[in-house]
Swiss-Prot record:
The chain crosses the membrane at residues 102-122, 185-205, 222-242, 257-277, 286-306, 316-336, 346-366, 411-431, 439-459, 484-504. Belongs to the SLC41A transporter family. One of its GO terms (cellular component) is plasma membrane. PANTHER family: DIVALENT CATION TRANSPORTER SOLUTE CARRIER FAMILY 41, SOLUTE CARRIER FAMILY 41 MEMBER 1. Residues 13-24 have a biased composition (Polar residues). It is found in: Cell membrane; Basolateral cell membrane. It catalyses: Mg(2+)(in) + 2 Na(+)(out) = Mg(2+)(out) + 2 Na(+)(in). Residues 1-11 have a biased composition (Basic and acidic residues). Gene3D superfamilies: SLC41 divalent cation transporters, integral membrane domain (1.10.357.20). GO terms for molecular function: inorganic cation transmembrane transporter activity; magnesium ion transmembrane transporter activity; magnesium:sodium antiporter activity; transmembrane transporter activity. This is Solute carrier family 41 member 1. The exchange activity is regulated by phosphorylation in a cyclic AMP signaling-dependent way. Temperature-sensitive, reduction or elevation of the temperature significantly decreases or increases its activity respectively. The lineage of its organism: Eukaryota, Metazoa, Chordata, Craniata, Vertebrata. The keyword Transmembrane applies.
Amino acid sequence: MSSKPEPKDVHQLNGTGPSASPCSSDGPGREPLAGTSEFLGPDGAGVEVVIESRANAKGVREEDALLENGSQSNESDDVSTDRGPAPPSPLKETSFSIGLQVLFPFLLAGFGTVAAGMVLDIVQHWEVFQKVTEVFILVPALLGLKGNLEMTLASRLSTAANIGHMDTPKELWRMITGNMALIQVQATVVGFLASIAAVVFGWIPDGHFSIPHAFLLCASSVATAFIASLVLGMIMIGVIIGSRKIGINPDNVATPIAASLGDLITLALLSGISWGLYLELNHWRYIYPLVCAFFVALLPVWVVLARRSPATREVLYSGWEPVIIAMAISSVGGLILDKTVSDPNFAGMAVFTPVINGVGGNLVAVQASRISTFLHMNGMPGENSEQAPRRCPSPCTTFFSPDVNSRSARVLFLLVVPGHLVFLYTISCMQGGHTTLTLIFIIFYMTAALLQVLILLYIADWMVHWMWGRGLDPDNFSIPYLTALGDLLGTGLLALSFHVLWLIGDRDTDVGD
C-alpha cells in the first residue's frame, strides 16, 4: 500500500474487503472511481472508502499464511454489523517497561547457559563420553536446535498472539497442533542429520568406524532432539498464553526462556539417553535401530498435522534452508572452539563460550522477534515497500532513532555488561573454569561481548527488514541465522581475546591452565 494515495489506488480498512457499490467521488480534483463503501469510524461517523474493482482479484500469498486467517473476512452488504475484528494495536512500551520485562528472562537464560556449562564439565568424564567420543560432536549441533527450532517457535507464536490469531479456542488449538507437529518433523530430521555428521567427523581423523557406535549416536541424537523439542514446545506455549493474559509482551519473555531451558534440558537429555543406551551396548544392540525406526516412523503423522495448519504449511516446505545453513555456521564456530581449547594455554576458554554465545543469541532473538511482530502489525511480507529498505540501515538509525525498535535495541545493548558481570561472578563462585577474573581479563571479555551484541543487533535490523521485503516471514527465517552468527562471533571474539591476553603477558598460573 502506497503512503501517497492517488486516484484508483486500492484502499482497505481492518483487513475487510466489502463489495463495492457504484458511486463517484466529489472531492476536489478527483476523478470518478470504481466504487465506494461506508465504514463506521472510531466516533461512529461514516467514513467513505474508495475501492478499486480489480482489488477483488488479488489473492493472498502462500508465504503469508500466518496472516491468512486475519486478513480476510466475509463480504456483506451490512458492513456495520458484519465486519472483521480490528487488528490489535501494538502494546505501548517505554524503555523502562521493555527493560523490566526482559530483565528476568534474560537473567534466567544466562543462568541456564552457566548451568549447561557446569553439566558438560561433569558429564565429560562419564564412560560414554570417554569411549564414544563422537558424542561431543553432537553437543553443539543439538544445542543449536534451540535457535533453529524452539526460539523460532517462540517468535512465531509470539507474533500470532500479538496480532490476535490465538484469541479463540479454535485458533489456539490449530496454532498449537500445527506448530508442535512442525517442530517434531524438524527435530527428527535435524537430529538424524546431526548424528550422520558426528559419525563422519569421527571417522575422518583416524579412519575408525563402528556400526554399534553409529547406531548409538543416531538413537541418542534423534531421541534427544525429539523429546527436547516436545518439552520445550509445551513450555513455550504455556509461557506465551500466560504472558498475553497478564498483559506482558510475549516477544520479551518467550525467546529468552526458550534459550535458558534449551541448553540445559538438551544437554541433560543427551547425557542421560546416551548413557542409558550405552549400558545396553553389549546386551541389547538391536534396541538402537528400533529407537531410530520408531521416531522416523512417526514422521508421516507429524507431516500430516503440520500440513493442516495454514500457519505452518509453508514453513514445512521452505523452512529447511535456514536450519541447515545455521548448522553449518555453528559448525565453523565449533571448529574455532575445538582448535582453541585443544591448546593447553587456552583451555580456560571452554567454560565461558556457552555464556557469551547464549547471551548474544538470546538478546538478538528478542530483537528479531519484536521487529517481526511490528512488521506483521503493519502489513504482509513483501507487500509494503516502505517497511523493507533496499540499503543497509545506518548504525544511527538502528540505535538512536525514536521508534520503538531502536529503543528496544538500546535497552538490550545496555543489559550486556551488568548481565555478564553477574554470570562471571556466578562462575567464579562455583569454581568453574581455569581463569582468574582479573581486571584486564574482564575488560577484554566485556569488549568481546559488547562487540558481538552490537554487530548482531545491527545485522538483525537489516536482515529482518530484508527478508520482509523479499516476502519471507522473519519469524521462520531470521532467528536461526542470527543465533548461529552469535555462536560464530562469540567464539571467534572470545578466542581472539584469549590470544591477545596471552601475547600481552597475562599468563598467570590460572589462565588457560
